[in-house]
Amino acid sequence: MLDLKKWMVATPVVFALSLGAQTTSPERPSAKILHDAAGDTSDNPGKIDTSLSPKIAHKDVRAAMKKVADWELGHSEAIFTQDWTYAPLYSGLLAASATTGDAKYHDAVLKYAEKVNWQLLPGRYDHADDEAIGQSYEALYLEKKDPKRIAALKENLDKVIARERDPKKDLWWWCDALYMAPPTFATMAKITGDRKYLDFLDKEWDLTTEHLYVPADKLYFRDATFLQKTEANGQKLFWSRGNGWVLAGLARTLSVMPNEYPQRAKYVALYKEMADRIAGLQQPSGLWRTGLLDQTAYKEDEISGSAFFTYAMAWGINNGVLDAGKYRPVVEKSWKAMLGHVFEDGRLGSIQPIGAAPGAFGPGSSYVYGVGAFLLAGSEIDKMAGMKGMKR
């Protein structure tokens, strides 16, 4: 039996929710403001940095992480937002500090969380995208158990659980949502010791999977509008970043889901099944294209989907879920290839802009979610460098 009292994180106060949520909500920024803050494309990004070493050694991995994180921090810290686009970046920056020992990345995230008073974006309480930033709030709470750090988030998640279900529409109707929300709910279960968060995410994950996952292909459609769409070669249309969101979401959910949870084995099986399929779709270059099943239709290697895949598989290696002998070469090849898209100033390019399907982009295209995925991947690869049998 799952004993959440043994598993939960000790909490000094049962949240004192009266201290948490603001009584007034600021106006939600316009979609254009949020979109424009997420990244840009440089027509003249300069030269690729050939000095970065692909060796899986602490010194080399951390140098690459710092190069990219420093550029991103200088480029976007002044325009941080609470939007989903930044959620992976904040997680990646926290991971970068933990990996490199440089506190400035962590401190930038903490400073912003304090600036917005640990709030979510207003106006869409049940939208998974707006819950994604909660993952960084939870991570910071686990460092210092100050109830205000998660009070607004907990109130929001409780409201989502209590809401009346719309039988005609899944709550998480697009596959990206499986990164945005489930890890947030799973971590709240860890913090509070309340299994209701796990049971809720389990129910909603099943509904999304029932409607979007194709067991024969071991991949997710982005949403229901893609069920009948095909590539030029006649294959089903499966978006790389969409499946990257899912695989990374599985890794992040499993990282906080207790071993004793009755449904955990289902998530492990799905994670391993998808990892096997995605590893087999890796291109000779080491990366993945935006469309997974028609390589002739999409010519460019893409970073964000590739980085999420790399992060998730490296996590699996480090946690004994994936066979290192099989997956380490996949991860090493991908890491080396991603370094080939870091420019001399630290810009990480070849990141597909915001979208919902395979699409075109330039080499200077850089967006915060792709940078966050790269930093998360680097943090797990750095752990690989410390494993027995790895070259240092």
Which positions does each model-derived feature cover?
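Bacterial N-terminal signal peptides that target proteins for export
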Residues: 1-11
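Bacterial N-terminal signal peptides
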Residues: 10-18
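CBM-like carbohydrate-recognition segments
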Residues: 28-87, 96-115, 119-134, 140-156, ...
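His/Met- and acidic-residue-enriched segments that coordinate or traffic transition-metal cofactors
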Residues: 45-64, 68-81, 91, 120, ...
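Asp-box/WD-like beta-propeller blade repeats and closely related beta-sheet repeat scaffolds
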Residues: 149-185
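Extended ligand-binding clefts on enzyme/binding-domain cores
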Residues: 175-179, 186-292, 299-310, 322-351, ...
